[in-house]
């Protein structure tokens, strides 16, 4: 599902954020990406959905060749890769319904399908009753749940979660993780960057640790491994 071979990413300022990454993530896997701040986790995550382009190497995501991909092909990749951000990135002037529908409208989904699918994903995140509200009428946890609903609206094969609980209190963080677990149980591949030691050590999954742009640890049912 996700393959990286000898992947490097060097920025114009000379910083090397990926220094020979090699990893194979299978269909349906749930993988935590951990490591110190500035270790290269965000670059690793962003290369998977082509927000960043690797300097050299090989990256395959669901049969898409990301190194040689043309910019015009990126939207096709992102139909198959959903992304959840720490800061939600909801459209503040649009309702909950409109935020989720927009993700499908841009890929020209039929209106009848959009309506049905919006309600399906809102049911998954337990927010059908908030469908007509604006983002600023929601709590932080509710906004993140809407962000997750939007990210899976197109039924992606891969879901990228970049610090999805970073701005949330502990109870709300567990609510978000329960939703991600349910999505994982339905067969979606999930790659989640996190600094949350308790979550990683409690909800056991594969753990990949990155330091100085290198994978230094890759363990099934792993531990967080860093002091916080």
Predicted regions and their residues:
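Short coil-to-helix segment of the ABC ATPase nucleotide-binding domain corresponding to the Q-loop/switch region
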Residues: 94-101
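Helix-to-loop junction immediately C-terminal to a conserved catalytic motif
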Residues: 49
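Conserved ABC transporter NBD signature motif
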Residues: 57-65
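Conserved ABC ATPase signature
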Residues: 133-138, 142-144
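Catalytic Walker B motif of ABC-type/P-loop ATPase nucleotide-binding domains
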Residues: 159-162
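A short, proline-enriched helix->beta-strand linker immediately N-terminal to the Walker B motif
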Residues: 153-157
């Amino acid at each position: 599902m996700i393959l990286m071979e000898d992947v490097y990413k060097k920025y114009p300022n000379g910083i090397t954020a990926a220094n020979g990454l090699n990893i194979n993530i299978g269909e349906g896997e749930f993988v935590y990406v951990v490591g110190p701040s500035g270790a290269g986790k965000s670059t690793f995550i962003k290369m998977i959905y082509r927000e960043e382009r690797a300097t050299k190497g090989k990256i395959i995501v669901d049969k898409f060749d990301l190194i040689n991909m043309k910019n015009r092909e990126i939207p096709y990749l992102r139909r198959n890769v959903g992304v959840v951000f720490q800061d939600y990135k909801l459209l503040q002037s649009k309702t909950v319904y409109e935020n989720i529908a927009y993700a499908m409208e841009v890929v020209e989904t039929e209106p009848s399908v959009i309506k049905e699918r919006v309600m399906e994903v809102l049911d998954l995140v337990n927010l059908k009753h908030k469908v007509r509200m604006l983002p600023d009428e929601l709590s932080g946890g509710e906004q993140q749940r809407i962000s997750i609903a939007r990210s899976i609206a197109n039924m992606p094969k891969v879901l990228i979660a970049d610090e999805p609980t970073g701005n949330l209190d502990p109870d709300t963080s567990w609510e978000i993780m329960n939703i991600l677990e349910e999505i994982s149980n339905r067969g979606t591949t999930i790659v989640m960057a996190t600094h949350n030691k308790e979550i990683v050590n409690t909800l056991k999954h594969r753990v990949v640790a990155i330091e100085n742009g290198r994978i230094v640890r890759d363990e099934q049912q792993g531990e967080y491994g860093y002091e916080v």
